[in-house]
Swiss-Prot record:
Residues 1-33, 56-77, 136-186 are annotated as: Disordered. PANTHER family: GATA TRANSCRIPTION FACTOR, GATA TRANSCRIPTION FACTOR 6. It comes from Arabidopsis thaliana. The keyword Zinc-finger applies. The lineage of its organism: Eukaryota, Viridiplantae, Streptophyta, Embryophyta, Tracheophyta. This is GATA transcription factor 6. GO terms for molecular function: DNA-binding transcription factor activity; sequence-specific DNA binding; zinc ion binding.
């Protein structure tokens, strides 16, 4: 209500000023301009109005706070009224709480010795806890059975004399040397001699086979007809497989291999007696046959005996 009254007063003052101005406009004079008393009164009225407005605002804020507080108290009263508990139960709960507090209370004594990690003295190292494995080995350790030493000399049927000599020397040295009585030595040292000899024999057999192969490869193979040692392919001849060179083998297969034929690369080639052309070989054979026939005819002619006539 007070705020409404203030607004009405302000509106009245504005109306008065407007009407006064209109009237003074009619009766306008210099004296009215120089009269400042009315303006001072108007300023005082405005200051008073502003102070009243500030006071009313403060009162409105305080009223709102009181309303909020009253609402909070009313809600709290409502909740407490909804959770009403009889006095006997409250007394029993208090008795139980006091009993529990008395029974659980134990005087706490402060520790006199500080731990190592607080004092900084780390000379004494913490030993780690050894954790035992929960899974134990199911297979127990098995002891090796001791075996009797073999005194006899083992001779291989396909071995050489040097191997038997080495095995006999090894057995004599082992018999002369003192043997420990541990079964592990018997199982590991004594019975490993035989596999070693086997491996040595295998190595020697492989070496012998390799030597024979290299010997056969290094042997100088030559043609049985012309004596050639290098040829792209070895062929079969009258002496067996791979006994003739490629050229001689081809002519032997076709039936044209003659003694007068020699390839040009043959070490026994001579231009007077041999040729690598079949036609020339035939001519040479004809000439030879004619010369041989002439010689035979000359030898077969009868020798004329000269009869010496005695003169009288």
């Amino acid at each position: 209500m007070e705020s409404v009254e203030l607004t009405l007063k302000n509106s009245n003052m504005k109306d008065k000023t407007l009407t006064g101005g209109a009237q003074n406009g009619d009766d306008f004079s210099v004296d009215d301009l120089l009269d400042f008393s009315k303006e001072e009164e108007d300023d005082d009225v405005l200051v008073e109005d502003e102070a009243e407005l500030k006071v009313q605002r403060k009162r409105g804020v305080s009223d709102e706070n009181t309303l909020h507080r009253s609402n909070d108290f009313s809600t709290a009263d409502f909740h407490t009224s909804g959770l009403s508990v009889p006095m006997d139960d409250i007394a029993e709960l208090e008795w139980l709480s006091n009993f529990v507090d008395d029974s659980s209370f134990t005087p706490y004594s402060a520790p006199t010795n500080k731990p190592v990690w607080l004092t900084g003295n780390r000379r004494h190292l913490v030993q780690p806890v050894k954790e035992e494995t929960c899974f134990k080995s199911q297979h127990p350790a098995v002891k090796t059975r001791p075996k009797r030493a073999r005194t006899g000399v083992r001779v291989w049927s396909h071995g050489s004399q040097s191997l038997t000599d080495s095995s006999s020397s090894s057995t004599t040295s082992s018999s002369s040397s003192p043997r420990p009585s541990s079964p592990l030595w018997l199982a590991s040292g004594q019975f490993l001699d035989e596999p070693m000899t086997k491996t040595q024999k295998k190595k020697k057999v492989w070496k012998n086979a390799g030597q024979t192969q290299t010997q056969t490869q290094t042997q100088t193979r030559q043609c049985g007809h012309c004596g050639v040692q290098k040829t792209p392919q070895w062929r079969a001849g009258p002496l067996g497989a791979k006994t003739l060179c490629n050229a001689c083998g081809v002519r032997y297969k076709s039936g044209r291999l003659l003694p007068e034929y020699r390839p040009a690369c043959s070490p026994t080639f001579s231009s007077e007696l041999h040729s690598n052309h079949h036609s020339k070989v035939i001519e040479m054979r004809r000439k030879k046959e004619t010369s041989d026939g002439a010689e035979e005819t000359g030898l077969n002619q009868p020798v004329q005996t000269v009869q010496v006539v005695s003169s009288f």
